[in-house]
Amino acid sequence: MYDFFSASLPELRPGETPPLTLAEFDADAELQLTPRHYRMMTAEDPAARVYGAMRRFEEYLRTRIAEKRAEKLKMPADFAEPEAFYGEVDAALGQLAQLDPAERERAVDLLRWKKLDELTWNDEFGFDHICAYRVKLRLAEKYRGRDAGTGRKFFDSAVRAMAEQ
């Protein structure tokens, strides 16, 4: 349905700076999508298949992370049973404990990215692909401007400010 628009979108890769911003994507999408699909996309309406599936995945992911934290802090963890199970989350969470917080955040976002790929592997030109692309773009934008050099500068300036007090 959205063949031309989908085909014109630049490729996104996890961990790389995206070639366009979310605002630019939304402006292009507004010209290409039906008004109904545009509203659903920008609202991340769970009635759209990708957004509904990602909401369930995200709830499961966050619940499992909260359970792991509660277990680590020896706190009671009385969480509701999820409506769906995602083995890839359970398998990955055990390995994430060894990572530093920044690496862990990237690994969790990679889980999200892979789930989006799984949801749209057979729909490269439809509305589901457009919705998944928008979520991936949001994930990629989160890391825009983040790099070790910039992080080191902020850290060094914070240490200097604390030393001067």
Labelled PLM ranges:
Residues 1-165:
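Extended alpha-helical surfaces
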